[in-house]
Amino acid sequence: MTHDLIEKSKKHLWLPFTQMKDYDENPLIIESGTGIKVKDINGKEYYDGFSSVWLNVHGHRKKELDDAIKKQLGKIAHSTLLGMTNVPATQLAETLIDISPKKLTRVFYSDSGAEAMEIALKMAFQYWKNIGKPEKQKFIAMKNGYHGDTIGAVSVGSIELFHHVYGPLMFESYKAPIPYVYRSESGDPDECRDQCLRELAQLLEEHHEEIAALSIESMVQGASGMIVMPEGYLAGVRELCTTYDVLMIVDEVATGFGRTGKMFACEHENVQPDLMAAGKGITGGYLPIAVTFATEDIYKAFYDDYENLKTFFHGHSYTGNQLGCAVALENLALFESENIVEQVAEKSKKLHFLLQDLHALPHVGDIRQLGFMCGAELVRSKETKEPYPADRRIGYKVSLKMRELGMLTRPLGDVIAFLPPLASTAEELSEMVAIMKQAIHEVTSLED
């Protein structure tokens, strides 16, 4: 049966963000999971070192979450949210508003983080039209930014490897610099931050009359390599958006729900977004639910008699699905009863200490961390910061070695991403970092 399943997967499946030639050479099929480990069809266990793409909170098969889904199944699995609502979607909306930045008063459900961002872009665009400023149609995106894979989200993204092929499909956006301290000329966080803010201020000064919104990941640029923003940068962006009357869209899809040691990462700098996208950890990693938060001011710009054509015409079939909302409610109840955010903040200190051990490795150039979002950047030369040639695929080789040693993750180029489930114990964190260290050492030693 094992061989048969592998052959079927090779014959029929097309996996996301995967060169299928690589999969054919190194196939993997997961069968089950318990706690922070998953098991493949051969019975081998692996630490879930990237939280099943940055979303698992409590581990796999958390009884309370399993039971919440079963209980909701006894009532109804799904009904539409078009023109009506349902019980768990309504209850979840109230809970989400209670835990979100105080100026956000409305939630719009969707199925993925990319769609949540797409919705935010469309809301921002239509907001200005609805209030009589249709000339504000353009967007500012951050260099190296990533917001998902729909055409709108790609248009405000800036990762060449992912996005260049779709250039003719994308709408044009202005690109603003982001402080990548390790690769900056000075290497000084304050200087790097201030220079980037000056360039953003100049861009806004020249173009604010045509700009609807700025989109930015919250505190950490994830897909570009776990780039942690220097203190004061996100707050500085908020101040500039306010000064130049530009909406601020904050992407909390990866960073939200405790991942950075705050419920939402923008809380680190007391930033109040105009629109905010969230997803991933909202259901504890169980079902696909996402949400776009909006201020009351934005909501009211759409609230009018139907004939005035201010309705927000967006929505998908499974928006506000009861099973997803029910498990999200239980997930957030566990956040409170188990003090998840406080625990992550405390365990992050232990994790920081553990990660410092990687600095001793000759090809680890930089280690970046905010909460349970971590990245180790591998370089050919630690002294010059020279990267490995892309065709060496060092990050990919390290991830395969980690799999062999009993831990799953996915590299971001030559940055080894480490985003463990929030429920990971200190002992489990120590074991996972040890696997990272061994894999990096073994692979880079062979590449010298």
UniProtKB/Swiss-Prot annotation:
Transmembrane segments: none
GO molecular function: adenosylmethionine-8-amino-7-oxononanoate transaminase activity; pyridoxal phosphate binding
One of the GO BP terms on file: biotin biosynthetic process
One GO cellular component term: cytoplasm
Predominant cellular place of this UniProt entry's protein: cytoplasm
Keyword Iron in record: no
pH sensitivity of activity: Optimum pH is 8.6.
Documented activity regulation: Inhibited by 7-keto-8-aminopelargonic acid at concentrations above 80 uM.
EC code(s) of this entry: 2.6.1.105
Pfam family name, one: Aminotran_3
Binding site for pyridoxal 5'-phosphate: 113-114, 251, 316-317
Cofactor(s) this protein cannot do without: pyridoxal 5'-phosphate
Binding site for substrate: 146, 315, 410
Subcellular location: Cytoplasm
Catalyzed reactions: (8S)-8-amino-7-oxononanoate + L-lysine = (7R,8S)-7,8-diammoniononanoate + (S)-2-amino-6-oxohexanoate
Family the entry assigns: Belongs to the class-III pyridoxal-phosphate-dependent aminotransferase family. BioA subfamily.
Description of how the protein assembles with itself and partners: Homodimer.
Entry protein name: L-Lysine--8-amino-7-oxononanoate transaminase
Source organism: Bacillus subtilis (strain 168)
